[in-house]
Regions:
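Long, contiguous binding/interaction regions
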Residues: 1-87
Length: 87
C-alpha cells in the first residue's frame, strides 16, 4: 500500500506555552511515523510547529493524527496544510 506525507500546522494555545514540551508530546504519537518537525516564527514570540507524518494511504489517517494532536496540552489548533503521496 502506498504511503503519504501529511504535514500539519500547529498553533499553541498561548504565547507563553512551552513549545519544547509540545514537540516532545508530538514525538510520542503512535498513529503514524513522525518524519520531521519544523518551527515557524509567526509574530511577537509566537512559534508554530509544522510536524510531518508518514502514514498509509488509507482514508482517515490525517483525521486520526489530528485527533491525537488535539489531545496534547498547550495546542490551540492543528490543521492539515499538505498531503503528498510518497513513491
Amino acid at each position: 500500500m502506498a504511503e503519504v506525507l501529511i504535514t500539519f500546522k500547529i498553533m499553541p494555545a498561548e504565547v507563553d506555552v512551552n513549545i519544547d514540551s509540545i514537540q516532545d508530546a508530538i514525538k510520542k504519537i503512535k498513529t503514524a511515523r513522525l518524519s520531521k518537525i519544523e518551527k515557524e516564527p509567526i509574530a511577537f514570540g509566537l512559534v508554530a510547529l509544522k510536524p510531518s507524518f508518514i502514514a498509509n494511504d488509507e482514508g482517515g489517517a490525517a483525521d486520526e493524527i489530528e485527533k491525537e494532536l488535539k489531545k496534547i496540552e498547550g495546542i490551540g489548533s492543528a490543521e492539515v496544510i499538505e498531503v503528498t503521496r510518497l513513491l
